Amino acid sequence: MDKENLRISFQEIEKKILLSDYLQEICSAIINKSISKESIDEILKRKSVNYSIAKVDFLHLIIEYIKNILEDDILTVTEKENVKFLKVMFRIQQGDFYYHNKADIEATIASQLSRIYQDNYISDEEALLKVDLQEIFDLSFDQMNDYAKVEAAISIQKGADPKSLDVFFTHKEFFKLKYDNNDNKV
Protein backbone atom coordinates (compact mmCIF):
# COMPACT_ATOMS: atom_id res chain seq x y z
CA MET A 1 0.00 0.00 0.00
CA ASP A 2 1.23 3.46 -0.87
CA LYS A 3 -0.29 6.22 1.25
CA GLU A 4 1.37 8.89 -0.88
CA ASN A 5 -0.37 7.59 -4.01
CA LEU A 6 -3.66 7.55 -2.09
CA ARG A 7 -3.04 11.08 -0.83
CA ILE A 8 -2.45 12.45 -4.32
CA SER A 9 -5.41 10.59 -5.82
CA PHE A 10 -7.80 11.65 -3.09
CA GLN A 11 -6.73 15.27 -3.43
CA GLU A 12 -7.81 15.01 -7.07
CA ILE A 13 -11.06 13.26 -6.11
CA GLU A 14 -11.87 16.03 -3.62
CA LYS A 15 -11.50 18.59 -6.41
CA LYS A 16 -13.46 16.54 -8.95
CA ILE A 17 -16.63 15.55 -7.11
CA LEU A 18 -18.93 17.15 -4.58
CA LEU A 19 -18.60 15.32 -1.28
CA SER A 20 -20.83 15.35 1.77
CA ASP A 21 -19.38 16.54 5.10
CA TYR A 22 -18.50 13.10 6.39
CA LEU A 23 -16.91 12.04 3.08
CA GLN A 24 -14.83 15.21 3.08
CA GLU A 25 -13.57 14.26 6.54
CA ILE A 26 -12.78 10.74 5.41
CA CYS A 27 -10.96 12.02 2.32
CA SER A 28 -9.02 14.41 4.57
CA ALA A 29 -8.03 11.48 6.78
CA ILE A 30 -6.77 9.62 3.70
CA ILE A 31 -4.93 12.72 2.47
CA ASN A 32 -3.40 13.26 5.93
CA LYS A 33 -2.48 9.56 6.08
CA SER A 34 -4.45 9.08 9.30
CA ILE A 35 -7.22 6.82 8.01
CA SER A 36 -8.24 3.79 10.04
CA LYS A 37 -11.40 1.78 10.59
CA GLU A 38 -11.69 3.46 13.97
CA SER A 39 -11.42 6.96 12.50
CA ILE A 40 -14.09 6.07 9.93
CA ASP A 41 -16.37 4.74 12.67
CA GLU A 42 -15.78 7.92 14.71
CA ILE A 43 -16.64 10.18 11.77
CA LEU A 44 -19.80 8.20 10.99
CA LYS A 45 -20.87 8.27 14.64
CA ARG A 46 -20.17 11.99 15.02
CA LYS A 47 -22.06 12.81 11.81
CA SER A 48 -24.90 10.35 12.64
CA VAL A 49 -24.46 8.45 9.38
CA ASN A 50 -25.60 4.84 9.23
CA TYR A 51 -22.90 2.51 7.90
CA SER A 52 -25.22 0.91 5.34
CA ILE A 53 -25.83 4.36 3.82
CA ALA A 54 -22.13 5.23 3.99
CA LYS A 55 -21.15 1.95 2.34
CA VAL A 56 -22.70 3.04 -0.97
CA ASP A 57 -20.77 6.32 -0.76
CA PHE A 58 -17.58 4.41 0.07
CA LEU A 59 -18.09 2.29 -3.04
CA HIS A 60 -18.42 5.49 -5.08
CA LEU A 61 -15.17 6.79 -3.57
CA ILE A 62 -13.34 3.59 -4.45
CA ILE A 63 -14.74 3.68 -7.99
CA GLU A 64 -13.53 7.28 -8.33
CA TYR A 65 -10.11 6.14 -7.14
CA ILE A 66 -10.15 3.30 -9.67
CA LYS A 67 -11.14 5.67 -12.48
CA ASN A 68 -8.31 7.95 -11.41
CA ILE A 69 -5.67 5.21 -11.45
CA LEU A 70 -6.93 3.82 -14.76
CA GLU A 71 -6.36 7.14 -16.55
CA ASP A 72 -2.95 5.83 -17.64
CA ASP A 73 -4.53 2.48 -18.70
CA ILE A 74 -2.31 0.58 -16.27
CA LEU A 75 -2.97 -0.98 -12.88
CA THR A 76 0.23 -1.31 -10.89
CA VAL A 77 0.72 -3.73 -8.02
CA THR A 78 0.72 -0.75 -5.64
CA GLU A 79 -2.55 0.59 -7.05
CA LYS A 80 -4.19 -2.84 -6.66
CA GLU A 81 -2.91 -2.99 -3.08
CA ASN A 82 -4.38 0.46 -2.48
CA VAL A 83 -7.78 -0.71 -3.76
CA LYS A 84 -7.59 -3.71 -1.42
CA PHE A 85 -6.64 -1.39 1.44
CA LEU A 86 -9.63 0.87 0.74
CA LYS A 87 -11.95 -2.15 0.61
CA VAL A 88 -10.68 -3.28 4.01
CA MET A 89 -10.92 0.21 5.51
CA PHE A 90 -14.47 0.68 4.22
CA ARG A 91 -15.47 -2.94 5.00
CA ILE A 92 -16.42 -3.69 1.42
CA GLN A 93 -17.37 -7.32 0.86
CA GLN A 94 -17.19 -9.44 -2.27
CA GLY A 95 -20.20 -8.68 -4.44
CA ASP A 96 -20.79 -5.17 -3.05
CA PHE A 97 -19.57 -3.41 -6.20
CA TYR A 98 -21.78 -5.53 -8.43
CA TYR A 99 -24.81 -5.25 -6.15
CA HIS A 100 -24.63 -1.54 -5.28
CA ASN A 101 -22.79 -0.02 -8.26
CA LYS A 102 -23.37 -2.29 -11.23
CA ALA A 103 -23.85 0.60 -13.68
CA ASP A 104 -20.62 2.32 -12.57
CA ILE A 105 -18.51 -0.81 -12.80
CA GLU A 106 -20.07 -1.71 -16.15
CA ALA A 107 -19.20 1.75 -17.51
CA THR A 108 -15.64 1.57 -16.18
CA ILE A 109 -15.08 -1.95 -17.48
CA ALA A 110 -16.71 -1.16 -20.84
CA SER A 111 -14.42 1.83 -21.26
CA GLN A 112 -11.32 -0.25 -20.52
CA LEU A 113 -12.43 -3.19 -22.67
CA SER A 114 -13.24 -0.89 -25.57
CA ARG A 115 -9.69 0.46 -25.42
CA ILE A 116 -8.20 -3.03 -25.02
CA TYR A 117 -10.12 -4.48 -27.97
CA GLN A 118 -9.70 -1.50 -30.32
CA ASP A 119 -6.80 -3.14 -32.19
CA ASN A 120 -8.66 -6.49 -32.43
CA TYR A 121 -5.88 -8.24 -30.51
CA ILE A 122 -5.30 -8.82 -26.79
CA SER A 123 -1.68 -8.65 -25.67
CA ASP A 124 -0.46 -10.44 -22.54
CA GLU A 125 -0.44 -7.12 -20.67
CA GLU A 126 -4.02 -6.39 -21.73
CA ALA A 127 -5.11 -9.89 -20.67
CA LEU A 128 -3.56 -9.25 -17.26
CA LEU A 129 -5.38 -5.91 -17.03
CA LYS A 130 -8.65 -7.76 -17.64
CA VAL A 131 -7.82 -10.12 -14.77
CA ASP A 132 -6.91 -7.15 -12.57
CA LEU A 133 -10.23 -5.44 -13.36
CA GLN A 134 -12.04 -8.66 -12.54
CA GLU A 135 -10.17 -8.86 -9.24
CA ILE A 136 -10.60 -5.26 -8.07
CA PHE A 137 -14.34 -5.35 -8.78
CA ASP A 138 -14.69 -8.85 -7.25
CA LEU A 139 -16.23 -10.30 -10.40
CA SER A 140 -16.40 -13.98 -11.30
CA PHE A 141 -14.73 -15.26 -14.45
CA ASP A 142 -18.15 -15.59 -16.09
CA GLN A 143 -19.17 -12.02 -15.21
CA MET A 144 -15.96 -10.58 -16.66
CA ASN A 145 -16.16 -12.86 -19.69
CA ASP A 146 -19.71 -11.64 -20.38
CA TYR A 147 -18.46 -8.04 -20.43
CA ALA A 148 -15.57 -9.02 -22.70
CA LYS A 149 -17.87 -10.86 -25.13
CA VAL A 150 -19.48 -7.59 -26.20
CA GLU A 151 -16.19 -6.04 -27.33
CA ALA A 152 -14.81 -9.33 -28.65
CA ALA A 153 -17.90 -9.77 -30.82
CA ILE A 154 -17.25 -6.37 -32.40
CA SER A 155 -13.64 -7.38 -33.05
CA ILE A 156 -14.73 -10.67 -34.62
CA GLN A 157 -17.16 -8.80 -36.86
CA LYS A 158 -14.18 -6.69 -37.97
CA GLY A 159 -12.33 -9.87 -38.92
CA ALA A 160 -10.25 -10.53 -35.78
CA ASP A 161 -9.08 -14.04 -34.99
CA PRO A 162 -11.16 -15.19 -31.97
CA LYS A 163 -8.12 -17.06 -30.60
CA SER A 164 -6.31 -13.75 -30.09
CA LEU A 165 -9.11 -12.10 -28.09
CA ASP A 166 -8.80 -13.71 -24.62
CA VAL A 167 -12.51 -14.48 -24.38
CA PHE A 168 -14.62 -17.61 -24.18
CA PHE A 169 -17.67 -18.08 -26.39
CA THR A 170 -19.82 -21.18 -26.20
CA HIS A 171 -20.00 -23.21 -29.39
CA LYS A 172 -23.51 -21.91 -30.02
CA GLU A 173 -22.54 -18.26 -29.37
CA PHE A 174 -19.51 -18.46 -31.62
CA PHE A 175 -21.36 -19.96 -34.56
CA LYS A 176 -24.27 -17.56 -34.16
CA LEU A 177 -21.77 -14.71 -34.24
CA LYS A 178 -19.98 -16.21 -37.25
CA TYR A 179 -23.29 -16.83 -39.04
CA ASP A 180 -24.57 -13.31 -38.31
CA ASN A 181 -21.25 -11.86 -39.45
CA ASN A 182 -21.28 -13.81 -42.72
CA ASP A 183 -24.96 -12.97 -43.23
CA ASN A 184 -24.16 -9.26 -43.02
CA LYS A 185 -21.48 -9.57 -45.72
CA VAL A 186 -23.84 -11.03 -48.34
Language model features with spans:
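Small-residue-enriched hydrophobic alpha-helices in membranes
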Residues: 1-186
